[in-house]
Amino acid sequence: MLKQRTIKSIVKTVGIGVHSGRKIELTLRPAAPGTGIVFSRVDLPTPVDIPASAMSIGDTRLASVLQKDGVRVSTVEHLMSACAGLGIDNLYVDVTAEEIPIMDGSAATFVFLIQSAGIEEQNAPKRFIKVKKPVEIRDGDKFARLDPYFGFKLKFSIDFRHPAVDKTGQELEVDFATTSYVREIARARTFGFAHEAEMLREIGLARGGSMDNAIVLDEYRILNNDGLRYDDEFVKHKMLDAIGDLYVIGHPLLASYTAYKSGHGLNNALLRELLAHEDAYEIVTFDDPQAAPKGFAFDAQTAFA
């Protein structure tokens, strides 16, 4: 059967919170089959566990924020994206603040951490959410949509009307049957505009944001001396975010995702719309790994890496 996966050993790192500017400790621990991805606020007098789920996402203005009984863990999408890309089903994520450290602004550090810990198959079938009917959410000219598809592919289009962004690829389509997440998506960094960063700092946010963990743009150009990691890094990062946003549903999707100018809020609304229609999806497993979509087999310790 196609099996669930966790990590082999505990692994730790320290990074900066993009909003608080504080030093944050992050520990990844193996978890039993059926656990899912569980975030734990170990800095609190009594640690609080928050399982990743579509219904636990609260605030989506600047990141995907998991919430439970007034306790928050923010900026989970890059780590969730790495877990999706590497096929991690079960994991405990201990964090000493209300946000996951930003690291370099991409998913690459989290991929490295997980690969350093090692990936282990577990004796339980991997559960997929198979989309059976189209589901779509719109907000003005923005939209996000899921269609039935035997595999996992995404098509994302952006439109920032900024000279430096417009010079790069605005549209990207990726099918993970033939594309490496680690090589083609994981290193794409978050990006922001210098004038917005100043406004955010004035209200106590983005205190840890810098060119070490983001692509920063002024009105005309990219300010980072080293430029871009990919020619189409902007749209690739939006896709990286979408992969993480979608993975909070708790299982890998068998679906085709299409989006135009979507963000964390629209992605979460799409998951909620899917879950609201029980006839639009089903949970499936694969007794024969060869019968699963290409890209999900336990190959080179990755999912579609």
Swiss-Prot record:
Keyword Transport carried by entry: no
GO cellular component: membrane
Top-level taxon in the UniProt lineage: Bacteria
Keywords: Hydrolase, Lipid A biosynthesis, Lipid biosynthesis, Lipid metabolism, Metal-binding, Zinc
Catalysed conversion reaction: a UDP-3-O-[(3R)-3-hydroxyacyl]-N-acetyl-alpha-D-glucosamine + H2O = a UDP-3-O-[(3R)-3-hydroxyacyl]-alpha-D-glucosamine + acetate
Cofactor(s), by name: Zn(2+)
Keyword Lipid biosynthesis set for record: yes
Gene Ontology biological process terms from the UniProt entry: lipid A biosynthetic process
Binding locations of Zn(2+): H78, H237, D241
InterPro entries xref list: Ribosomal_Su5_D2-typ_SF (IPR020568), UDP-acyl_GlcNac_deAcase (IPR004463), UDP-acyl_GlcNac_deAcase_C (IPR011334), UDP-acyl_N-AcGlcN_deAcase_N (IPR015870)
Molecular function terms, GO-annotated: metal ion binding; UDP-3-O-acyl-N-acetylglucosamine deacetylase activity
EC number: 3.5.1.108
Pfam families: LpxC (PF03331)
Enzyme active site: H264
Biochemical pathway: Glycolipid biosynthesis; lipid IV(A) biosynthesis; lipid IV(A) from (3R)-3-hydroxytetradecanoyl-[acyl-carrier-protein] and UDP-N-acetyl-alpha-D-glucosamine: step 2/6
HAMAP family, sorted: LpxC (MF_00388)
Function comment: Catalyzes the hydrolysis of UDP-3-O-myristoyl-N-acetylglucosamine to form UDP-3-O-myristoylglucosamine and acetate, the committed step in lipid A biosynthesis.
Sequence similarity: Belongs to the LpxC family.
UniProt name for this protein: UDP-3-O-acyl-N-acetylglucosamine deacetylase
